[in-house]
Amino acid sequence: MGEEGFLAHFAFSIGGLPITQSVLTTWFIMISLFIMAWSTTYKCSLLQPSTYQLIWEGVLSTMYDAIKEVLPEHVELIFPFVATLWIFILVSNLIGVIPGFYSPTADLSVTASLAIMTFLSVHWFGIRAEGWREYLKHYIKPTPFLLPFHLISEISRTLALAVRLFGNIMSLQLTALIVLMIAGFLVPIPILILHIIEAIIQAYIFGMLALIYIAGGIQAHELKSQGESL
């Protein structure tokens, strides 16, 4: 699993720009997921779907239904983002069980990037759904004095997203390393099962929190608009 730290270890540099293990693994995951998505859609068939296609359809249908339960009115708008987030984080969490690979989500810079992207998406989808004027009015209602508190709330939950995922994945890998150092390879299967379960749970939690934040932003503005129109 390699050694973990607050930042991924340096691998090499390109033009003075440091490339870390987490960056390399992230590139590998992105390329792999792109190839998998392309191969699935390229060979997609309505009459004779392959087992591979049925598996992906089942996974995406489950995600779609989960998002629809939270935000049915805007499911088509936010489904691509949340589903991509779920899949990427899950693969990033799981790849650490493969010898020689480093889990990008055990790197604080990666989880911070995901949290910032989620933070931006909350406002992007809110503006798409309500318009930028109505959306921004929320931060100064009922009084402009609440603006600093709204900003603090947005920043704090973004930090919480980043630190939560990073802390859980890094501690999981460190725990597995310590157990393997003490017990050797007598208990690899329980450790592997624990890693897989935790990886799935953390990906689900991060994706659901992102979904709830997006839904909360959109619905809060819709409720305010409805209340003002009454």
Curated annotation (Swiss-Prot):
PROSITE patterns named among the record's database cross-references: ATPASE_A (PS00449)
GO cellular component: plasma membrane; proton-transporting ATP synthase complex
Short name of any one Pfam family annotated for the protein: ATP-synt_A
Keyword Ion transport carried by entry: yes
Family the entry assigns: Belongs to the ATPase A chain family.
Record key words, sorted: ATP synthesis, Cell inner membrane, Cell membrane, CF(0), Hydrogen ion transport, Ion transport, Membrane, Transmembrane, Transmembrane helix, Transport
Location (main, coarse): membrane
Species name: Legionella pneumophila subsp. pneumophila (strain Philadelphia 1 / ATCC 33152 / DSM 7513)
Protein name, as recorded: ATP synthase subunit a
